[in-house]
Amino acid sequence: MASLKEIRAKVTSIKSTQKITRAMQMVAASKMRRAQERMEVGRPYAESMRRVVSHLVNASSDYKHPYMTNRSVNRVGYILVTSDRGLAGGLNINLFKKLMHHVQEFQNQSVEAEFAVIGSKGVSFFKSFGGKVTSAVTDYGDNPTFEQLNAPVQAMLDDYANGRLDRIYMVYNKFVNAMTQQPIVTQLVPLPDSAIDSADAGINTELSWDYIYEPDVKTLIDGLLNRYIESIVYQAVMENIASEQSARMVAMKAATDNAGDLINDLQLVYNKLRQAAITREISEIVGGAAAVS
């Protein structure tokens, strides 16, 4: 059994760790609130872009952009968004499981896959377990610009435009609330019907005006579809950042609480040992006094 000195040293060590985890919990809570605000600010832009694109697409049924054209699937690409740092519970592990399950379904149909990664945890995952990574970006911080994230996204879109990829998926953690993060795999291109459907986009076709487009619908669609996809990717990254901070806050709270439980248990053992030592000393004193008398 450990001595009183060893137990005191353990308690001191755990208290130091508890201070660190409590501080990390508070920092994560603050960062989560800021990430939530940025995420909420970005949503109206993404939804507005979706409505504009939907209106343009439905106004010009003659032109089909490559991003709206389905083709037979021989090779798929995944844009994977992970965190740069750990200590976030099972956030990244659950996302990897979701991704691998989705990839396995395609592999069972002899469809190949390649990956573009945002976040160092995703890069580390593929280094350990294999997988063709065509592009990656790390250290993107808590408030990245799209320019920081553009390289892997553009690499995937170029491969799709060149016919090397037949479908692209976006993989990230959706922020539900402070306690819940949901791993998501969603089709990016070709755009799913729900992305360009008037009803799903919130457009009332009965009250919709007929616009004059300059220079022409094709040019507008070509430009806006790229911006729309950029907005989807950026919003996914914002969701993942908020998810990361909320998961870290929860994990650090659990670590802080567990440290408190360990301290209480060790304190109980310490008190019992100390009580036993005092009792033994008293017994020795009483025994010695009795022997003298």
UniProtKB/Swiss-Prot annotation:
Keywords: ATP synthesis, Cell inner membrane, Cell membrane, CF(1), Hydrogen ion transport, Ion transport, Membrane, Transport. Its main location: membrane. PROSITE patterns: ATPASE_GAMMA. Gene3D superfamilies: 3.40.1380.10, ATP synthase, gamma subunit, helix hairpin domain. InterPro entries: ATP_synth_F1_ATPase_gsu (IPR035968), ATP_synth_F1_gsu (IPR000131), ATP_synth_F1_gsu_CS (IPR023632). One of its GO terms (molecular function) is proton-transporting ATP synthase activity, rotational mechanism. Pfam families: ATP-synt. The keyword Transport applies. GO terms for cellular component: plasma membrane; proton-transporting ATP synthase complex. It is a peripheral membrane protein. CDD domains: F1-ATPase_gamma (cd12151). It comes from the Bacteria. GO terms for biological process: proton motive force-driven plasma membrane ATP synthesis. Disulfide bonds: none annotated. It is found in: Cell inner membrane. F-type ATPases have 2 components, CF(1) - the catalytic core - and CF(0) - the membrane proton channel. CF(1) has five subunits: alpha(3), beta(3), gamma(1), delta(1), epsilon(1). CF(0) has three main subunits: a, b and c. Belongs to the ATPase gamma chain family. Produces ATP from ADP in the presence of a proton gradient across the membrane. The gamma chain is believed to be important in regulating ATPase activity and the flow of protons through the CF(0) complex. This is ATP synthase gamma chain. It comes from Psychrobacter sp. (strain PRwf-1). The lineage of its organism: Bacteria, Pseudomonadati, Pseudomonadota, Gammaproteobacteria, Moraxellales.
